[in-house]
Amino acid sequence: MALTPESPSSFPGLAATGSSVPEPPGGPNATLNSSWASPTEPSSLEDLVATGTIGTLLSAMGVVGVVGNAYTLVVTCRSLRAVASMYVYVVNLALADLLYLLSIPFIVATYVTKEWHFGDVGCRVLFGLDFLTMHASIFTLTVMSSERYAAVLRPLDTVQRPKGYRKLLALGTWLLALLLTLPVMLAMRLVRRGPKSLCLPAWGPRAHRAYLTLLFATSIAGPGLLIGLLYARLARAYRRSQRASFKRARRPGARALRLVLGIVLLFWACFLPFWLWQLLAQYHQAPLAPRTARIVNYLTTCLTYGNSCANPFLYTLLTRNYRDHLRGRVRGPGSGGGRGPVPSLQPRARFQRCSGRSLSSCSPQPTDSLVLAPAAPARPAPEGPRAPA
């Protein structure tokens, strides 16, 4: 997936056949170090072992990730589509992961055969798919975090939103991701140089560096700062609610918050090393041996696919949390099997019940189902002593 210029003699990016041609590092025709790279040097035992290992690992990730994300899509659409708000975002996350994992067969084929079989269209589509799904994932996570924030601190605002606004937000995340991906889809092309073929962008090194820096800002830095700010304010709100006089039992929404944060942290853990590796080669030519550079490239590539492979497990926990919460609401108070009162659904309610202190003490429940139960009726006046029968 990556786009790091690297010494062609060590790891020629996107090379299909033939030997590499020496070029100045960082020059306009610098090769691209990526998951679409294929070593064109004569095969040795070490190369065969590395190719077999990376091919096996990526294939296993692809199988597990595709099955897991497909399962997530089926379960989410069947179980939560009609009742929970989160299903729109979980479906979008699973779809982005699924599309990203479907590129693995093309990578493995390039590694094993040491040839690029997919032509100019393959260069544009596969590179574009990488960046499209990456941005769609992080933008969706940002929207999820923003909605969790609003559900906790601004519950009265969320109930006034139209019913289908989440679908519009999901569509907007994909359109924005496509807009950021279009430059690389239009600029990437298949170039033949003697006996080898390379996928190279049509722009020069400065434009290439500027574009990669922009992608880092839009996929890691910008969303990271925004999500960090939202969760910092949520943490402060939780601390204040714990100090309140009337403490409330922890609701399932708090667990949903932790799961969303876990998905975000997993994304950063898998993609931050990848992007640091890309930018390092753009702004500083690290004196790495070819073998070391190849290992780093393999590891960062596997990390990005590992994210899409591991996400379905968190998605399953998130959807299960919502299913349990919805079942608890249907049972109503006092039927939680000894686990304490469970918040029940009031059909004609419009607002979420708060603790009476502030909106920040409200429980972070899904906004479409966390409707506020009507106020408790006034306590009747105490009756006088009854006359003896």
Swiss-Prot record:
Biased composition (Pro residues): 377-389
Keyword line: Cell membrane, Disulfide bond, G-protein coupled receptor, Glycoprotein, Membrane, Receptor, Transducer, Transmembrane, Transmembrane helix
Residues in the Cytoplasmic compartment per record: 78-87, 147-167, 233-258, 319-389
Record's bilayer topology term: Multi-pass membrane protein
Residue intervals on the Extracellular side: 1-54, 114-124, 187-209, 285-297
Biased composition (Polar residues): 1-10, 30-39, 355-368
Biased composition (Gly residues): 331-340
Tissue: Most abundant expression in the heart and pancreas.
Entry superkingdom: Eukaryota
GO CC field: membrane; plasma membrane
Cystines in this chain: C123-C199
Glycosylation-annotated residues: N29, N33
A Pfam family reported for this protein in Swiss-Prot or TrEMBL: 7tm_1
Residue segments, region Disordered: 1-39, 328-389
GO MF, any single term: urotensin II receptor activity
Membrane-spanning parts: 55-77, 88-113, 125-146, 168-186, 210-232, 259-284, 298-318
Compartments where located: Cell membrane
GO BP annotation list: blood circulation; blood vessel diameter maintenance; neuropeptide signaling pathway; regulation of blood pressure; signal transduction
Family of the protein in this entry: Belongs to the G-protein coupled receptor 1 family.
General function of this protein: High affinity receptor for urotensin-2 and urotensin-2B. The activity of this receptor is mediated by a G-protein that activate a phosphatidylinositol-calcium second messenger system.
Protein name: Urotensin-2 receptor
Gene: UTS2R
